[in-house]
Design a protein with these regions (language model features):
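Thiamine diphosphate
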Residues: 1-164, 169, ...
C-alpha cells in the first residue's frame, strides 16, 4: 500500500468542517490555541465569526461549547486527544455527557504516532475514558474519506460524539462517496482463518498484513471498526462464528479500547479466542512515528507474526 495517496485525518477534519460550514449556519467551531495543529484554522479563515479560540483552557472550552449547544448551535470542540479526553474529562462527563448535549469533540494527535512530542502528548487512553460516559459515541476513522464522512455523520447525529483524528498521514483506502454509518463496521477483505478487527491507522496495516498472510496460505478477514461505541455487535459475532479466531488492532491501550470492547461482547455472547494488538500497559516514547509504531508492535509485520502463531 506504499504507493497509495496518504493524508492525515486531522487535515480531513479541518476540510470537512469547512464544507459543512458552507451548508449549515448553526455549525460553530471551538479551539484551545491549537487551530494550526488541529487544522480548524481552515474553518477560521472561511468563517471567522463562527470560530472561537478559548486559549489554553480546554475545560472552559468544553463548558462554553456545552452552553452554546443549548441555543440550537452545533459546536465542534477541538484540541489534542490528551487534553480533550484527559484534561477536560470532568467537563466532558458532567457538562456534555450528563445532560446529553449536542456537542461534538474533534480530538487530534491521538496515539503514539504523535511521535516526537512524547509520552505526555501520546494519548492511548482516550477510547477507554470516553467509552465510560453514558450516551457518548466514540469513533476513529481509517482514512481521509472516512474521516470526512464521519464528521458529517457526527453533525447529523443528535447527542455527544467523540472523534479521534491522527497527526500521521495514512493511505486513502476508501472511494469517494463512501457511505459511513455510526455504529456500523465494514468488511474490507473476506477471509476464513482469522478475522482482524482494526480501526484508525491500523486498518491499513491490517490490510497489508492480510496480503502477506495470504502468501503463506492464511486467509485473513479484515474489518474496519471505526465506531468503538456503539460497537457493531452483529458484525463482530458474524466474524467470530465464521473464522473462529479474532485479532484486534488499535493505536490505543489494550485496556479500555476496541480490543476490550470486542472481548467483552464475545465473552458474553460467543466465547472466541482473541489476540489484542495495541499499546500494552506502558507509556509511549519520543521518536519518529514510524519507528514508534514498529517498536510497540503496531505494524503489519507484527500483525502477521501474531496471526501466524495464532493460526498454528
Amino acid at each position: 500500500m506504499s504507493d497509495m495517496v496518504k493524508i492525515a485525518t486531522r487535515d480531513s477534519y479541518g476540510n470537512a468542517l469547512v464544507e459543512l460550514g458552507k451548508e449549515h449556519d448553526n455549525l460553530v467551531v471551538f479551539d484551545a490555541d491549537l487551530a494550526g495543529a488541529t487544522k480548524t484554522g481552515t474553518f477560521l479563515k472561511a468563517f471567522p465569526e463562527r470560530h472561537f479560540d478559548c486559549g489554553i483552557a480546554e475545560a472552559n472550552m468544553i463548558c462554553v461549547a456545552a452552553g452554546m449547544s443549548t441555543t440550537g448551535l452545533v459546536p465542534f470542540a477541538s484540541t489534542f486527544a490528551m487534553f480533550a479526553a484527559g484534561r477536560a474529562f470532568e467537563q466532558v462527563r458532567n457538562s456534555i455527557g450528563y445532560p446529553h448535549l449536542n456537542v461534538k469533540i474533534g480530538a487530534t494527535h491521538g496515539g503514539i504516532s504523535v511521535g516526537e512530542d512524547g509520552a505526555s502528548h501520546q494519548c492511548c487512553e482516550d477510547f477507554g475514558l470516553m467509552r465510560t460516559i453514558p450516551g457518548m459515541v466514540v469513533m476513529s476513522p481509517a482514512d481521509d474519506v472516512e474521516a470526512q464522512a464521519m464528521v458529517r455523520a457526527a453533525y447529523l447525529h443528535e447527542g455527544p460524539v467523540y472523534m479521534r483524528f491522527g497527526r500521521a498521514a495514512v493511505p486513502v483506502i476508501h472511494e469517494e462517496g463512501f457511505n459511513f454509518q455510526i455504529g456500523k463496521g465494514e468488511t474490507l477483505r473476506e477471509g476464513k482463518d482469522v478475522a482482524i478487527i482494526a480501526n484508525g491507522l491500523l486498518v491499513a496495516e491490517a490490510l497489508t498484513a492480510a496480503e502477506e498472510l495470504a502468501k503463506e496460505g492464511i486467509e485473513a478477514e479484515v474489518i474496519n471498526m471505526a465506531t468503538i461505541k456503539p460497537l457493531d455487535e452483529e458484525l463482530v459475532l458474524a466474524a467470530a462464528k465464521k473464522c473462529g479466531k479474532i485479532i484486534t488492532a488499535e493505536e490505543h491501550s489494550v485496556i479500555g479500547g476496541l480490543g476490550e470492547a470486542v472481548c467483552s461482547l464475545l465473552s458474553e455472547k460467543l466465547p472466541t479466542p482473541v489476540k489484542r494488538i495495541g499499546v500494552n500497559d506502558e507509556f509511549g516514547h519520543s521518536g519518529p512515528a514510524g519507528a514508534l509504531l514498529k517498536a510497540f508492535g503496531l505494524s503489519a509485520e507484527n500483525i502477521v507474526a501474531v496471526a501466524k502463531e495464532f493460526c498454528k
